[in-house]
Amino acid sequence: MQTHEIRKRFLDHFVKAGHTEVPSASVILDDPNLLFVNAGMVQFVPFFLGQRTPPYATATSIQKCIRTPDIDEVGITTRHNTFFQMAGNFSFGDYFKRGAIELAWALLTNSVADGGYGLDPEKLWATVYLDDDEAAGLWREVAGLPADRIQRRGMADNYWSMGIPGPCGPSSEIYYDRGPDYGPEGGPVVNEDRYLEIWNLVFMQNERGEGTTKEDYEILGPLPRKNIDTGMGVERVALILQGVPNVYETDLLRPIIDLVAARAPRGYDQGNHADDVRYRIIADHSRTAAILIADGVSPGNDGRGYVLRRLLRRVIRSAKLLNIDTAIVGDLMATVRDAMGPSYPELASDFDRINRIAVAEETAFNRTLASGSRLFDEVAGTTRSSGVSVVSGSDAFTLHDTYGFPIELTLEMASEAGLTVDEGGFRELMAQQRRRAKADAAARKHAHADLTAYRELVDAGPTEFTGFDELTSEARILGIFVDGKRVPVVAHGQAVDADRVELVLDRTPLYAESGGQIADVGTISGTGSGSSARAAVTDVQKIAKTLWLHRVNVESGEFVEGDGVVAAADAGWRKGATQGHSGTHMVHAALRQVLGPNAVQAGSLNRPGYLRFDFNWQGPLTEEQRGQIEEVTNQAVQADFAVHTFTEQLEKAKAMGAMALFGESYPDEVRVVEIGGPFSIELCGGTHVATSAQIGPVTILGESSIGSGVRRVEAYVGLDSFRHLAKERALMAGLASSLKVPSEEVPARVASLVERLKAAEKELERARLASVRAAAVNAAAGAERIGNVWLVAQRMSSEMTPADLRTLVGDIRGKLGSDPAVVALIAAPAGGESSTVPYVVAANRAAQGLGLGANELIKHLATAVDGRGGGKADLAQGSGKKPAGIDAALEALRAEIARVG
């Protein structure tokens, strides 16, 4: 029975039983605690917790699931997969244990003709939680299972939770006995290879708290209603019904293995375990990568993007280890599409994008792999020559940090080479790097000598931010800090230039930098007896997300802790910042409208008149896409959409479609910014305009890459946009005047001039190459005979580039015939003793036979000119730093040839 038929029978069975069919959710949900959807019930969690009322009493779905904690085990055995399909039926306060057992048993054992899977009831076993007598009794009553085929297990095996706080409850698992070929009898508690788990019925009745293991967590209490959550492994049922030994032989994964086998010189399942592991890695990871890309993930350096990158890199390297030297990822994606497309049509409809992203990662990683593999070989050789078998943490860190070689690949390659890696040392160096980066960032941001100095104020309560409603507020000074140390008073001239002066107020209208929006500037002035005190606010930062630190320059008077003050945000600055921030929301919405929902925000910066927006996307935008994004943005600005801000419960806000950043931690109650109804809805704590027209024109300046899979759009807004356009207009007018053509003809005129310039450059290059060829003829004519060896060893003109030298030595060597011949050319620099000295050596086969290899001869040149070089026996090159040694270098070469030849 094919997998698509297994899926269809499952859904049909439960729909006939009154369940609502619910499509699979994306493997990515707006949940900062969950990297990927890893169970069928995840999309129903709000229903199970009673946070939302389900629109149906019972449901059924087949959910895409991804689990990557044991990614390193994939392929080593046939039990692990990173992607799998979880078929499930769910009851929200409707049926409970009896209904779940009856429905599952019927589907498994009903005949194929009656819509079931036709499994032999005598081969089915069940496990229940230790004290769940009710479930054990139902298995005997409903299914007729004898007591010896119902086994009891503890919390680690038969008490289910997601591994994080949320729903939980006792479970009952159904196993299929695959027979004595797979191990000894005795049931699941004895052997889970022979007795294969195919379905887990969770009797979800409690809510769990935090914990560190499967058994160590607190049961917080009962859920509002008793629920059922079941999960049947589609791939596992497929291997049983298709009569194959493991999931890699099923109709979904075997086509991928067959594709690889057609390209690799060594086949699958030919007695080579290492090769079989590589085949299975490619099959599993290709499928998971395609699903991730289809659901909007792009390769990156952290979070979900890093998982995808790691999967693709393991695919690529496994193919290399199978001696597949040509690109294969595109073919793999097509095979996944063909196998999985009937169940997941997005793999076909979005194939061009999926393929483009995957192939781009292959191209980039092949470059890294080529250089990194050579470097690793050097490290491995040095490690062995030192008489040890452990690659140092320092070497592993250098490979990672300097050359971009992933630690996972270093670990794999070390293992294959019979070495281990000092992971502890590597992790410590990584931690040190992160600490340095964090400390540097903190120093740049806060310049705090001792953060504990602020602890008392942090504990006393948050600063009240009034800036959403007013730009001027009366406040009281809670604390004064000079260079990170608390003081009772600060006066004009008291702090030296290098010191930072910070005022902490109980309330403030000045916005503290956060959410991509830079801080307000403004003033803090004394009141009453302190009316002469005035400070310019140059920056506002947060401590512990609650305390506003106003960095100030005290311009007059003095400030005393406890005094009343008036804090004022600069109105012009704030207006520009709000234009930038609201403009960012508009550009984000336009990006998603033009590019689709996969264009997900990765960062932003908003300052007066300017915005910068980073988003996940593979490849540059076309001119047409840039134009569309700019047009959609400005159309929305001109529509004068109302801007509404309000607070809402996090789950309700997400249900409204509010955009949330993955990896961000949000409180239960969040602030929502809505522009033009559905046009833009985001979770945001920043300041915004009242209507979209107040943003003013938006001009996109450009779009660029800032990392693999991340693009950046920059734009001017408001008056800055107008000024930019005015400059562009003036520039165009100046060009038109200089070129003596109307403005509309400038592009054609410039293109014509560029073509003429290219033609002139080609003519100059032809003349230069003719000069180089003439030099080759002259140099060959000056060949000298040393023993049995012809030698051309000459100083060349400073105009010769390293590429010219390589061309010359090849030409000259070809003119010297079949006798032993060596050519060595050094370009004499024109810049004096500080200039670089390039040199190239070539040796023909006859010279190499005498032991005169270019890679050895070049060392004599390098020594004399204080340089270095390398290459192969036929051709080597290098450069030095000592032009005065050129003559000595050529003489050293002559001496070596005289010695050998």
UniProtKB/Swiss-Prot annotation:
The lineage of its organism: Bacteria, Bacillati, Actinomycetota, Actinomycetes, Mycobacteriales. Signal peptide: none annotated. InterPro entries: aa-tRNA-synth_II/BPL/LPL (IPR045864), Ala-tRNA-lgiase_IIc (IPR002318), Ala-tRNA-ligase_IIc_anticod-bd (IPR018162), Ala-tRNA-synth_IIc_core (IPR018165), Ala-tRNA-synth_IIc_N (IPR018164), Ala-tRNA_ligase (IPR050058), Ala_tRNA_ligase_euk/bac (IPR023033), DHHA1_dom (IPR003156). NCBIfam families: alaS. This is Alanine--tRNA ligase. Zn(2+) binds at H581, H585, C684, H688. It comes from Mycobacterium marinum (strain ATCC BAA-535 / M). Catalyzes the attachment of alanine to tRNA(Ala) in a two-step reaction: alanine is first activated by ATP to form Ala-AMP and then transferred to the acceptor end of tRNA(Ala). Also edits incorrectly charged Ser-tRNA(Ala) and Gly-tRNA(Ala) via its editing domain. Belongs to the class-II aminoacyl-tRNA synthetase family.
